[in-house]
A protein has these predicted regions:
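Hinge/lid segment of periplasmic solute-binding proteins
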Residues: 100-155, 181-184, 289-300
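Short, polar/charged alpha-helical segment
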Residues: 43-65
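Extracytoplasmic "Venus flytrap"/periplasmic binding protein-like
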Residues: 62-130, 166, 266-267, 285-288
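Glycine-centered hinge/linker elements that transmit conformational signals in sensory
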Residues: 184-188, 222-254, 294-299
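Extracytoplasmic/periplasmic solute-binding protein
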Residues: 141-149, 154-156, 181-226, 234, ...
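Short, solvent-exposed loop/beta-turn-alpha elements that line the ligand-binding surface or hinge
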Residues: 119-130, 173-175, 216-236, 242, ...
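Conserved C-terminal helix/tail region of periplasmic/extracytoplasmic solute-binding proteins
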Residues: 383-453
Length: 453
């Protein structure tokens, strides 16, 4: 009897201790937690995520004693650099944030062992609510280190107001923008019609090349090496180079949205999230302004039989803490952010796609619920692509980030040089067709040389 009583007393004591520990491991208003976050959503304008974070802090955050503090809103490349500086304790580096949004490549920068495994805190049922492909990207081995919060696809954006004016004079129509062949022909025609203005800016040549090669049944990257000597690459390089050398493609650095504001270009390919930065008017060189209508169209195709597009977007990472309250606070915020209502509010104000199946279905069941016409056109374009396009995630391989950045820089440098030579040689009286043909071939050879393939 005494042994039984002693056992029961010991068991009761252990349960009390465990309950107390469990309570102590959760944030509360009496024992609050502040989490610092770096993110990429809205670095050039009002941030939809900041607005939602404010809502969290006023509601669920207050109930649990959690404050999410936005420290930095910037580009993904800037976050990569800042994380690297913090991880390496470089002089002047910021303290490592508790939460950050980034691409999978950063796991190596901060160390996978230092990241919070979300699968330890989400039940199987909770994880099953996520769109399977989006969730898969976040796994490193068997650990879920990157939680999807928003994804984007690529689309074709158009200043419809100025384009319609151009169409009235030339007979070009929006149907000509369905393929890259048509886009590049339109770019040359626009250059002539406008007196020397570029038509389009391509925000990501690596994506252009990746999807273009896929359309021809060939991989852009094999064994970590670009396959630029393939006939398939030559077939997608030639029309691109011709339009760029002619002057129809803007090759300068910077964002397309900035050039929309001054009508330096009237179109671009880029992330669906570009809609967040599109201006509602243009300012001309004489300081007059004009209201414009911006519209989105599906990503142009390369061949009749193969339509493809990149989907992208990083996810939410959390630094693992020895203070379990901080881990729990990160999880509470992450679960709140990915709930259908909050996730839809966030993504539809930023041009992104929701990350759970239910939210996905709710969005595309009725696009009329989206008030702004330019945003509605983005999701209409995505809906079209969901029906008939293959969606590709970029491959991860050693040096992928550097390869992509180098390719972007090399394409622009090679085409800028060819463009300058074209203007000079034509000005000296050489035959335009002969010069163009030579420069297309020379630019490809130079790109292959620079890429080391």
């Amino acid at each position: 009897m005494k042994k039984t009583l002693a056992f029961l007393l010991t068991l009761t004591l252990l349960m009390t201790i465990m309950a107390g520990c469990s309570h102590q491991q959760m944030p509360s208003p009496a024992d609050p937690v502040t989490l610092n976050i770096w993110h990429v959503y809205g670095s050039q304008t009002i941030s939809p995520l900041n607005t939602l974070i404010d809502e969290f802090n006023r509601s669920v955050g207050r109930e649990h004693g959690i404050t999410v503090n936005v420290v930095s809103v910037t580009s993904s490349s800037a976050i990569d650099e800042a994380l690297s500086a913090s991880a390496n304790n470089e002089p002047g580096a910021e303290a490592m944030p508790d939460l950050f949004t980034a691409y999978p490549r950063v796991a190596e920068i901060v160390g996978k062992e230092n990241l919070l495994p979300w699968d330890d805190y989400f039940t199987e049922n909770e994880l099953s609510a996520f769109h399977a492909e989006f969730l898969t990207e976040g796994y490193f081995g068997d650990r879920l280190l990157m939680l999807p919060v928003a994804k984007s696809a690529e689309a074709f954006f158009l200043n419809q107001t100025l384009f319609d004016r151009f169409c009235a004079d030339t007979g070009i129509t929006s149907d000509d923008l369905a393929s890259f062949e048509g886009v590049f022909q339109t770019a040359r025609t626009y250059y002539d019609w406008s007196g020397g203005q570029s038509f389009i800016q391509i925000n990501d040549y690596y994506h252009y090349a990746y999807v273009g090669m896929k359309a021809h049944g060939v991989e852009l990257v094999r064994g970590g090496t670009l396959q630029l000597d393939e006939d398939a690459f030559r077939s997608i390089w030639t029309p691109l180079a011709e339009a760029a050398i002619y002057g129809g493609i803007c090759l300068d650095e910077g964002y397309a949205a900035a050039r929309w504001k001054t009508a330096e270009v009237i179109a671009n390919t880029g992330s669906t999230a570009d809609v967040l930065y599109q201006p509602s008017e243009v300012i001309y060189s004489d300081n007059t302004t004009e209201a414009i209508k911006a519209m989105a169209y599906p990503y142009p195709t390369f061949t009749d039989g193969a339509s493809g597009v990149i989907y992208r977007g990083g996810g939410l990472f959390a630094m693992k803490s020895s203070d379990e309250r901080r881990n729990q606070a990160a999880v509470i915020f992450a679960k709140w952010l990915t709930e259908e209502e909050h996730n839809l509010t966030f993504v539809t104000n930023a041009g992104y796609l929701p990350v759970t199946d239910n939210a996905f279905d709710a969005l595309f069941s009725d696009l009329n619920q989206i008030e702004k016409e330019n945003y509605r056109s983005v999701y209409a374009a995505v809906e079209t692509m969901l029906d008939s396009y293959t969606f590709y995630a970029l491959p991860l391989y050693d040096g992928a980030s550097e390869t992509q950045l180098d390719f972007e820089a090399n394409v622009k440098a090679v085409l800028k040089s060819a463009r300058n030579q074209y203007v000079k040689r034509i000005g000296n009286g050489e035959d335009p067709e002969t010069v163009m043909e030579a420069l297309i071939a020379a630019s490809l050879a130079e790109l292959i040389s620079l890429s080391g393939t």
